[in-house]
């Protein structure tokens, strides 16, 4: 993947403004609420019976923070995301058997939460385009083991 200077700047700039400890839990909770079939991968997380239960679930919040830690690794390795994510791809494919379409759903929820947080002034069309390109590269890297 080729990144322009403007794309790198937009991605790194947005990341610098995000609070991963806030956005990660929000995005994962949103994914579990909007796409309830994704809950099947989180059977050990306890009560996921309602939106309020999901939003207040500490295991959901912790895994949301873990997801954001993974995105931070991708940002620090933007020129080598596939290699950076190779172990995660193997784990999600071979051990956890996660449907790879769910990565795109979660990426979309991350984008929605970021857009809601920053609005059109902080999440304009150029930032959104770069951010979604970045997340699509991350999703592709996570799906690599599935091909």
From Swiss-Prot:
This is Hemoglobin subunit beta. Heterotetramer of two alpha chains and two beta chains. Red blood cells. Residues 2-147 form the Globin domain. It comes from the Eukaryota. Keywords: Heme, Iron, Metal-binding, Oxygen transport, Transport. Heme b binds at residues 63, 92.
């Amino acid at each position: 993947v080729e990144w322009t200077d403007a794309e790198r700047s937009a991605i790194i700039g947005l990341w610098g403004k995000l609070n991963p400890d806030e956005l990660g839990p929000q995005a994962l909770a949103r994914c579990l609420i909007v796409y309830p079939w994704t809950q099947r991968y989180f059977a050990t997380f306890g009560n996921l019976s309602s939106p309020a239960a999901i939003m207040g679930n500490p295991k959901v919040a912790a895994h949301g923070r873990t997801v954001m830690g993974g995105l931070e690794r991708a940002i620090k390795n933007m020129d080598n995301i596939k290699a950076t994510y190779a172990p995660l791809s193997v784990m999600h494919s071979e051990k956890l058997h996660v449907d790879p379409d769910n990565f795109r759903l979660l990426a979309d929820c991350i984008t929605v939460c970021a857009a809601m947080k920053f609005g059109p002034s902080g999440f304009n069309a150029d930032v959104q385009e770069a951010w979604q390109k970045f997340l699509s590269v991350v999703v592709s890297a996570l799906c690599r083991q599935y091909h």
